[in-house]
Amino acid sequence: TAQRDMNAAVSCERVEEIFQKAMSDLDAVKPGDIEVTFRLIGALEATQDVDLTKDSYLPEYVTWIPTTSYDLQEDATVYDLYTKAIGEAGLRSIGEENDYVRTIYAPSCLGGYALSEFTNGARSGWMYTVNGTHPDRGLKNWKLKDGDVVVWHYINDYAHEAADWFDDPDYPALGDGTYYNGWLRAADISPEQYVQQLLGKILKVGKNGTVE
């Protein structure tokens, strides 16, 4: 009998715990919440400065956080989304508190290197798009709306790769559009999946003895 009473008490405590968790979850979803998506696209470290005016050398873009949905309050900014996404992914970055991200550290499975402004060349750095367009302000000053699609991406050579700066004389678009939005060519998969695919390619040796 004593054992049954103890089991019943434990069960009641468990039910109460589950109930409190459910109420907490309901409180967290308040009317007016918005749902947005976020994707983070980095790049491999360059072995030379990227300058698409001179040659076609371009480090590969790699997704660091695949497209993920996030629930935020209706007055949330890109900063709120960015810090939530980076934090949940366990990544580190520098500068967001000052409204300009200078550095993001790659996922550990990719080596954890620091990818910063100018790492891959004089016109390289971090940018972001909302619904496909680069906003004209910092991440703390852009409010999000329900359904917004945010892509935070590295750019190796903004003069050749950013398609939406035609009217800004300080950032003239160069080239013929060949390299526009190159970061979007990265597969929308986790960095772990990218590494697995890369290892698979390395291990797949063709009949002629070369790596395919």
Residue ranges and their predicted role:
Residues 1-33:
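Beta-rich interaction/scaffold domains
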Residues 21-211:
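Ubiquitin-like/PB1-type beta-grasp interaction modules and other compact soluble beta-rich domains
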